[in-house]
Amino acid sequence: AMLLQAMKPVTPYEMGETEVPGMYTISIDGLGSKPVEYTVQLPPDYDPYRSYPCIVALHAEGKSPVDQIQWWCGNLNKRMNMRMGQAGRYGYVVIAPKWTRDGKTNYGFTVHEHAAVLLSLRDALKKFSIDSDRVFLSGHSEAGTAAWDIGLAHPDLWAGVIPIVATAEKYIGRYWQNGRQVPFYFVMGEMDGNQLEINSGEFNRYLQRTGFDTMIVEYRGRGHEHFQDEIHHLMRWMRAHRRAFTPEKFTCSTLRPWDNFFFWVEVDDLPEDSIVMPIMWPKQNVRDVEVVAEIVSDNRIRVKTAANKITIYFTPDMIDFEQRVSIYTNSSNTTKAIVPSTEVMLEDVRTRCDRFHPFWAKHEYSRSR
């Protein structure tokens, strides 16, 4: 694990001369045969032996990934031959995936859109030196809605989520419990139609219930805008937040088969009557699948969920590998030795691309049907 942390990125990107120093557009394999493209802007004097915080910035409808790079990093100063914006000043790597579907401008809550964002992040973790505990997700307008949804669906990935003029739609209301696990910073305008009314149900949950870290900023007399004047406050907020990688206790919900990894628990084979694909929305009388997990004292782990397959991953922060571990999964109880495995560790780094927090071992459980 220490060797993995000390390594440079696994497949460092060959950085040649570009028109804008430190900006590269990269194409990778997406789902199926469709490639995914993302643009990355590195901070000045980028050094692969250091680790940098990161912003995954999703562009609004009708905009491009470069527009998001410019929002966070500023325009190119031709005299200085560098961008002079806030992200570069604070040493952030900015990743801007081309997440929209061909011919579509609205966010569809689909697996392809999630994959475009998550695969871009994972590829960037392979190629660039990114601090995986300080990765923030942001988006404007429809992309703000996407950031809100993806942030709730995959709360284990983010140090914080920044939806700007976003709308609470579809799964966002059903995944509200997941919001306890990730900080949110919302920005909106008072005159932006009835956005506050639409979002008020979720905002009330986040502000009135315990365990949420939520900031909501409303600009008086302003409408549906990009709100770049908020960027200094955003930088201060991000500086104060880091991801909690192995929370001792969490409850998360899922309705989609690809929203199945939460911190140190992976679930598969969800009950058919609890799956709602985006094209089927709204589906009546559907109960989401809850994943309730807890690290208890004395080397005990508890996981309860309606999913039929559970994989629990372990790190030294969670258990003492020299002692036997008691694992409670649904109605099954077992006490066994959990042995660290190099194979598990390397496979985990290959798939999740998180060199700073590899899992050392895993335990698999399948419910008998």
Regions found by a protein language model. Give the residues of each.
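C-terminal catalytic histidine-bearing segment of alpha/beta-hydrolase fold enzymes
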Residues: G193, E197-R300, T305-K309
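A domain-start/cap signature at the N-terminus of enzymes
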Residues: A1-Y52, N333, V339-F356
